[in-house]
């Protein structure tokens, strides 16, 4: 059996105004090679961008991989590691019996994460972590670039 490739992924989301223009930034490292991705949306939220970044990164992988995914978003990390199990059992409802926010993205993240073996890591934002800082710049730049793309799942 072939060993899965080990990919290091760093992600961040940004939103100006929250809601407002937003963007995500991704840095991917594999065997000394680095790939960066970013994109912006006209109207979204910070949490949606924090979720979309790992989705886009994981969906870009062409085969099942071992992934170390690092983000400064406790919302994303806690959600995918802990909360999602209860939400799925309750039909995507919270413990307060309200619909889970950003359910479209949570479902996408759940689906794509099952294809890979993922170590979900958290890093404190704006604390000098090089890849996280780079993701922050990419995400903020995408949000500031007057994006016109529509975040179809955003519901104010």
UniProtKB/Swiss-Prot annotation:
It is found in: Cytoplasm. Mg(2+) 2 binds at residues 12, 136. Its cofactor is Mg(2+). It catalyses: Endonucleolytic cleavage to 5'-phosphomonoester. Mg(2+) 1 binds at residues 12, 50, 72. The keyword Transit peptide does not apply. Pfam families: RNase_H. Binds 1 Mg(2+) ion per subunit. May bind a second metal ion at a regulatory site, or after substrate binding. Residues 3-144 form the RNase H type-1 domain. SUPFAM superfamilies: Ribonuclease H-like. Its EC number is 3.1.26.4. It comes from the Bacteria. Keywords: Cytoplasm, Endonuclease, Hydrolase, Magnesium, Metal-binding, Nuclease. GO terms for molecular function: magnesium ion binding; nucleic acid binding; RNA-DNA hybrid ribonuclease activity. One of its GO terms (cellular component) is cytoplasm. Endonuclease that specifically degrades the RNA of RNA-DNA hybrids. Monomer. NCBIfam families: PRK00203.1. PANTHER family: RIBONUCLEASE H1. Belongs to the RNase H family. This is Ribonuclease H. It comes from Shewanella sp. (strain W3-18-1).
């Amino acid at each position: 059996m072939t060993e899965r490739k080990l990919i290091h992924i760093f992600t961040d989301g940004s939103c100006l105004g929250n809601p407002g223009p937003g963007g995500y930034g991704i840095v991917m490292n594999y065997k000394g090679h680095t790939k960066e991705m970013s994109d912006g949306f006209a109207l979204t939220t910070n949490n949606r961008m924090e979720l979309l970044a790992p989705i886009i990164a994981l969906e870009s992988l062409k085969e099942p991989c071992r992934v170390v995914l690092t983000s400064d978003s406790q919302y994303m990390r806690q959600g995918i590691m802990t909360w999602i199990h209860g939400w799925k059992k309750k039909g995507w409802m919270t413990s307060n019996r309200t619909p889970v926010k950003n359910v479209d993205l949570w479902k996408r993240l759940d689906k794509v994460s099952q294809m890979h073996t993922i170590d979900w890591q958290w890093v404190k934002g704006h604390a000098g972590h090089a890849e996280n800082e780079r993701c922050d710049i990419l995400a903020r730049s995408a949000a500031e670039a007057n994006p016109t793309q529509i975040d179809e799942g955003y519901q104010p």
